[in-house]
UniProtKB/Swiss-Prot annotation:
Family: Belongs to the amidase family. GatA subfamily.
Designated name of the protein: Glutamyl-tRNA(Gln) amidotransferase subunit A
GO molecular function annotation: ATP binding; glutaminyl-tRNA synthase (glutamine-hydrolyzing) activity
Enzymatic reactions: L-glutamyl-tRNA(Gln) + L-glutamine + ATP + H2O = L-glutaminyl-tRNA(Gln) + L-glutamate + ADP + phosphate + H(+)
Keywords: ATP-binding, Ligase, Nucleotide-binding, Protein biosynthesis
Record keyword Ribonucleoprotein present: no
SUPFAM superfamilies recorded: Amidase signature (AS) enzymes
Gene Ontology biological process terms in this record: translation
PROSITE patterns associated with the record: AMIDASES
Self-association and partners: Heterotrimer of A, B and C subunits.
Length: 487
């Protein structure tokens, strides 16, 4: 079958289950697409073709014995390159970890391996997940398959570009301030960040520990639900893992929307690009047609979200990245004169400009003379944002808004303007600060570029968000569109 890349994870699972298709055939199809198209996209940092074919062969053998591990068994995928993979380089997109080969496997990776996933390789990302455009990778920029002169979003840009171009059916990502949802929106696919603590952070290279959360990028909400079924759940090895974390995400798919109230924040519309606002209103109208009630609400504290997010995340990054000093592991400068020179040059040469910028911001915010004025103020802003959401959820079940303020912008257009880059996360960072689940789904196109809309729910409401997006996708075909040169 030559159209296998058009199919969803759910459809591929059915073909494999019915033995209409073998995993080896499926894997060869996607490896061929990776070989053909990745040079145009630069989505992969490394590929693992031999490993993938071995995984696929093992999957076929299990299925012949009636012992498939899960619906995902035998389906190719890719991991964002900050999930540790034993024996396979894990770089976090940085020169600092260019030669780092982990001796252990991240819990998220291990759970998907146990489900029978077929690993095709490690996907590019902004260095240490610090970026919104995937121009900050040591291994070069990733290109948006809808327009290769534009960014795919970040920091999970490799994951988003690979799924959008149909190089793989799904990929993992991580989301600290929008790094799953924003690239999903720019690339015309579905991406979900679960409630903080739902997916284990063990073996995931840290950016900001109180904000980081593993997520999923796929064509559809149904696919995201099937994948989360396998990768989510409490992990005793991760102190931030929540014992209440859900392990079943597809049980509400196809439920009626009657009785569900969707809040539309009026302050999200102020200053929003008119064409994006039109897509948002059209999305709200379809949800209303499907039975939901649309109610205008106000989120009172979101004006401090960007400042609070960048201070907190930079402060945590400055602490997390202290370990990369040229002594323990990671990049080490050549011929250091003394220990001080070793530290200074290893970090100066090993980290890129954006990572060094955020380390400096974080170190400054945590310094004794400025802690109260900056970091503590940001923490108060974070609490206000959570309280604003909790108040909003007394009026509605789910909040609908834009995922991004614009469509994907040209490569290089904001790389020298960090404030403009930061503002691209305007609608996504609040969910991370509050630890809430949030999902972006395709909502149409503007001048040939995808637009995403975002659903934010109360803690552990992922099944409801996934059902809403699933019902929307049953009525639309935005998620089925493929960039012209990748069909």
């Amino acid at each position: 079958m030559s159209d296998l890349h058009h199919k969803t994870v759910a459809e591929l699972a059915t073909l494999l289950h019915n033995k209409t298709l073998s995993s080896v055939e499926l894997t060869q199809h996607f490896l061929s697409r990776i070989q053909q198209y990745n040079p145009k996209l630069n989505a992969y940092i490394c590929t693992t073709a031999d490993r993938a074919l071995a995984d696929a062969k093992a999957s076929d053998e299990r299925r012949q014995k009636g012992a498939a591990h899960s619906p995902l068994d035998g389906i190719p995928m890719g991991h964002k390159d900050l999930f540790c993979t034993k024996g396979i380089a894990t770089t976090a997109g940085s020169k600092m970890l260019e030669r780092f080969i982990p001796s252990y496997t991240a819990t998220v990776v291990a759970r998907l391996e146990a489900a029978g996933s077929v690993l095709t390789g490690k996907l590019s990302m902004d260095e240490f997940a610090m970026g919104s455009s995937n121009e900050r990778s040591y291994f070069g920029a990733v290109y948006n398959p809808w327009d290769e002169q534009r960014i795919p979003g970040g920091s999970s840009g490799g994951s988003a570009a690979a799924v959008a171009a149909r190089l793989i059916p799904y990929a993992t990502g991580s989301d600290t301030g929008g790094s799953v949802r924003q690239p999903a929106a720019y690339c015309g696919i579905t991406g979900i960040k679960p409630t903080y603590g739902t997916c284990s952070r063990w073996g995931m290279i840290a950016y900001a520990s109180s904000l980081d959360q593993a997520g999923v990028l796929a064509k559809t909400a149904q696919d995201c639900a099937l994948i989360l079924n396998e990768m989510a759940g409490h992990d005793p090895k991760d102190s931030t893992s929540n014992p209440k974390a859900l392990t079943q995400f597809d049980h509400e798919l196809n439920r009626d929307l009657d009785g569900i109230t969707i809040g539309l924040p009026s302050n999200y519309l102020a200053g929003l690009d008119a064409k994006i606002a039109e897509k948002l209103q059209q999305t709200a109208a379809l949800y209303e047609k499907l039975g939901a009630t649309i109610k205008e609400i106000t989120l009172s504290a979101t004006d401090v979200a960007i400042a609070s997010y960048y201070l907190i995340s930079s402060a945590e990054a400055s602490s997390n990245l202290e370990r990369f000093d040229g002594v323990h592991y990671g990049y080490r400068c050549a011929n250091p004169k003394d220990l001080s020179d070793l530290y200074e040059r290893s970090r100066s040469e090993g980290f890129g400009a954006e990572v060094k910028r955020r380390i400096m911001i974080g170190t400054y915010a945590l310094s004794a003379g400025y802690y109260d004025a900056y970091y503590e103020q940001a923490r108060r802003g974070r609490r206000a944002i959570l309280n604003s959401f909790l108040q909003a959820f007394k009026e509605c079940d789910v909040i609908l808004g834009p995922t991004t303020p614009t469509t994907a912008y040209p490569l290089g257009s904001k790389v020298d303007d960090p404030v403009a880059m930061f503002l691209g996360d305007l609608y996504t960072v609040s969910a991370n600060l509050a630890g809430l689940p949030a999902l972006s789904h395709p909502a149409g196109f503007i001048d040939g570029l995808p637009v995403g809309c975002q659903l934010i729910g109360a803690h552990f409401s992922e099944p409801q968000l996934l059902n809403l997006a699933h019902r929307f996708q049953q009525e639309t075909d935005f998620h089925q569109q493929i960039p012209e040169h990748y069909r």
